[in-house]
Amino acid sequence: VRSVLNKNSIWHNTQRNLRRQNFSDKSVYKVMKQLYQYTHKHFVTFPVAYWSQTPQGDSLLVSGRVYLPKYRILNGIIVANHYTMTADEEVPSNRLSMEMVYLLKGYAVIMPDYVGYGLSRDEIHPYLHWRSAAQTAVDLLNCMPELLDYYGYSYPKDVVVTGYSQGGAVA
């Protein structure tokens, strides 16, 4: 586990978030070890880059994260829109997320970072502009047929859109 905890990895950021929640070093190590072993056995996850738009309608390269169960039959896709985040290290492309629990039921999970985070961190995050945040989710979902085909998955018939806090407004 320690070999993958480089400064900018999702593992490092997940570990840092556990420490911020007052987990002891021993507990953090135990959780990270189990999480690492589980993830490599049951699912794959990777950051993605794709085109979306700024609130003004200009094209912009943005990022997000995709989680796929290792078996090739999907029950559906969950578009999980995240809550308000204040630091780039917290966004989906830079850490593991609790929304990956949907993998246990055979769902792919996709999570956009939103404009102003991840690859678009140089842009101002338009916090109350729900339409631009929703556009990043729609554009990520529109990438899924090609991405799933590339990795050998069939496109499922069900798509569920969910979110919490800011993500609830986006959904």
Predicted features by range, described:
Residues V28-G76:
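N-terminal cap/lid segment of alpha/beta-hydrolase-fold proteins
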Residues G152-S165:
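Alpha/beta-hydrolase fold nucleophile elbow
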Residues P55-S63, Y67-K105, D113:
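Short, surface-exposed "cap/lid" segments of acyl-processing enzymes
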Residues Y127-Y150:
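Alpha/beta-hydrolase active-site loop
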